[in-house]
Amino acid sequence: MRQENVTTYVRFRGDLSFKDSPFNEIDALIFTLLSYIDFKGIASYEGSITLREASEKVIALESGDPIEGHRKSAPHELELLDLAGHSKRFGDTEITYFVDELDKKEVRQFCAMHFVFERNKSFVAFRGTDDTLVGWKENFQMLYAKNVAGQIRAAEYLSETCKNDLKHLFVKYYVGGHSKGGNLAIYGVLHCDESAIKKMVKIYSFDGPGFEQPFEEMPRYQEIKDKLMTYTPKFSAFGFCLDHVRLDHTVDSFNNGLYQHDGYSWIVDGTHFKDAVRDEESKRVEANFKEWVHSIPIDHRESFVNALFDVLEESGCNSVSDFLNLNMSGVITVIKNMINIPSEERDLIIHIILFIINEDRKSKQTVDSRIVEKVENFKENLALENLKNVFNTKTDKTEKAKS
């Protein structure tokens, strides 16, 4: 029997207004998940549109032929959007201050919006990492950079939109995000205008990565520590990257392993998440990941990240989907490009690919069938088990030719 999740929550509690049943942690996760929907051309910064109207426009748009530049939603994303958009609880929520920016030069993937769910109450949602390589490169930059472009933009965005002027005098703000979005929410609150912080009620991070700097050493921690709520599934690798903020709530999930990062798999019990105990295997993965990261000097991490994404971009990939869908010709291009990388950096790239694929094998259960198919196709083409032998053979030949 399938456990209840955010979708069943809306299905069975969507007829209750926020006056009937006050805003809770499940509502917060729902808004962060809705921020992954591509509202470009539908929502705007200056104007507003109800979630009901926006849902109808997105569904109509995605029912036709694919549109270049528009990210098509997964079936479960559209289901949540449709249910929420036509519910009493969420339908009249207004989307405003919508921004969606992708800057390859600055390595910034940033999307944020306000969900005004009651008069004078707004949830500020930061989107997590999308399918773009720009977004993933920005994630990897967190391994060595004090801050990344998206974090700086998050602070600017909160200062711009969480105003304390006469028009917004009585507005209270809830801020949050899933995955990288949770990290952006926390960083943004810590670095935005002081006047904006005073208007914030809660800050939510749903399996968001931490920071290189210990969180308690950051300025303003004392101001926000009682407002901050962090949630991680019982198997969490993402939420414990670097120095994790803190562990407030461990959530049960009906997925396995790394796929518990998917907020749609989190088990809901009424107006709360079902509690769980952190998985021992998750602790092992965290320890291995941190050991691997700490083994790389900070000054080498940047060159490693640049080398990794240069290889992917030179193969013609702009997204993770492009990478997973590479045909044999594309795979050969990747291998050829990697041969020219210094052996130390090349070994690190192989290590992280093997690590992710290995965890994928152990974790696969109830996930989007399209993702499973893409991963299987890529593994079949790349033949990762033989990858090191391929590199070693080709490198030996290259060295002999040089001598």
Which stretches of residues belong to each language-model region?
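Alpha/beta hydrolase fold serine-hydrolase catalytic domain that processes acyl esters and thioesters
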Residues: 1-26, 31, 35-43, 49-122, ...
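Gly/Ala-rich beta-loop-alpha elbow adjacent to hydrolase catalytic centers
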Residues: 176-181, 185
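Short glycine-enriched nucleophile-adjacent loop
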Residues: 185-194
